[in-house]
Amino acid sequence: AVLISVLVLPALLYLFFVYGQSEVFFQTLDYVGPDEVVANDGGFDTVHYTIPDFEFYNTDSAVVTRTEMDSTIYVLSFFFATCPTICPAMNFHLNEIQKRFKGYDQFKLVSITVDPEKDSPSALKAYQKERNYDPAKWTFLTGDQAAIYELAKAVYLNAFEDQTAEGGFLHSTSAIIIDWDGHIRSRKDDLGNIVGSYDVLDVTQLNDLEDDIKVLIAEYERDKHNQRDE
């Protein structure tokens, strides 16, 4: 309990800082992907890009859809269990991120295999158990390979077979943040360009990822607070 308090405390202090400030000082993350302008009551609204619906299977063979992840902030990545190169390091760093927010129920990790033929629900369950990854905080998914690769493309990450690569697959070392409405969120770089994703093998980008999760948590809690006051 003491360890959890120490790990979560920086995020809680950030929330306290944000709520102690005027609304005008609140800074949040940008939306990734093309916006759509739609007519509404004689005016126009901006609809932010939402990741496509998906239907995959978790380690208990239960169906998980995108809409079931609503009201959750999650970091999405791609991997495969027999990956001999980058995946062990990727998931080590992602696990450290997860530990930082262990006390916040609305935050999770979601990792989707790019090798569903080998990575069945039971295989992923064994993989998760062997590495002691918390099933309450980290969801591993498998499913139709074509659907997985289409989702990767739709969220601007790479995932495909490559027989010349070690393990037979190539995928991004980057992860993305998905907010509670299915939007990809990210900071801007020093030149004002939206970063989009975070290379979890890069220490600087890992720190950015952690900081940006705190920002989204603050925004989510602020919005819930404002809705209660309406």
Give the positions of each predicted feature.
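Structural micro-motif
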Residues: V2, A136-W138, Y149, V155-T164, ...
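Hydrophobic beta-strand positions
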Residues: E55-F56, I177
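Short loop/turn microsegments at loop-to-beta-strand junctions
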Residues: I51-P52, Y74, S172-S174
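N-terminal targeting signals for export/organelle localization
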Residues: A1-I51, D223, R228-D229
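Short active-site neighborhood of thiol/selenol oxidoreductases, capturing the structured segment around
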Residues: V64-L94, L109-V110
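Structural microenvironment flanking redox-active thiols in thiol-disulfide oxidoreductases
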Residues: N91-L151
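Thiol-/selenol-based redox modules, centered on thioredoxin-like
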Residues: T164-E230
